[in-house]
Amino acid sequence: MLGASEPEDVIKQCTQVLEHIANDNSVPRNIRRSANDILATLKNEAEPLFLRTSSSISILEDISNDPNIPLHTRTLIWNVASQLETIPVDE
């Protein structure tokens, strides 16, 4: 994930990680459902980029506090949120 500077590249990398989380059966269903919701939000090009990323970050922060989430998944979620935070708001 490091080194991605273009917002499209960041979105692409984040969607790959989120797809991995959504397809991981060791992750609780509510977390997988949220990952699918975030994927749908990020892929919805009818909304501005800053709105898609801020909505996604909000959902990621909510699910990262879930006590049932596996540690490896929590780390992935934090990484995705950090990457999404690098996308500039003014575009």
From Swiss-Prot:
Signal sequence interval, chain numbering: none
InterPro entries referenced in this protein's UniProt entry, alphabetically: Ta0600-like_sf, UPF0147
Alphabetical list of Gene3D superfamilies matching this protein: Ta0600-like
Disulfide-bonded cysteines: none
Superkingdom per UniProt: Archaea
NCBIfam families registered for this protein in UniProt: PRK04330.1 (NF003319)
Family assignment from sequence similarity: Belongs to the UPF0147 family.
Name of the protein in its database record: UPF0147 protein Mbur_0922
Species in which this protein is naturally found: Methanococcoides burtonii (strain DSM 6242 / NBRC 107633 / OCM 468 / ACE-M)
Lineage: Archaea, Methanobacteriati, Methanobacteriota, Stenosarchaea group, Methanomicrobia
